[in-house]
């Protein structure tokens, strides 16, 4: 999530004079969906049944892969258990994360590459080769018919939550500066999101 947008060159790269934000030195230059931003990497783990956010995290590191284990620890601390299934996009896919999930006995589904919108990979066929590495095993798993169906759930579980927070509620940038304050602000956004979900569920059940 940005603290501010960055000027870019014709090639789409950040300009050389946009390498540091003196008003928020904790923030880093990150690649976002709309180009380069000066901001933070916001993480959210979302319950598949009710779109409740069960864990959050904020850092200034661009790679999502390094955030998986800390997020799993937060999920465990907040809920007392790990999820029955874990669905994550390609940013979280790494050999270490795949092997760690296998060691935990966690039924994980990591996208092994970014797919164009509306396109699905060709299903895997035949017995799996015995010499597949971690990425090969995961690629085969998510290309199965069952794997494709499970991975498709991410578009109706996680992505709508970010859309509701950033698009519907207009919370698309941080108002405060510094990693600690940004973390608190993101936690507050998640809390109010959950309150809204619980309120609507209570009204529906009344």
Where are these regions (language model features)?
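Anion-binding and metal-coordination hotspots
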Residues: 1-206
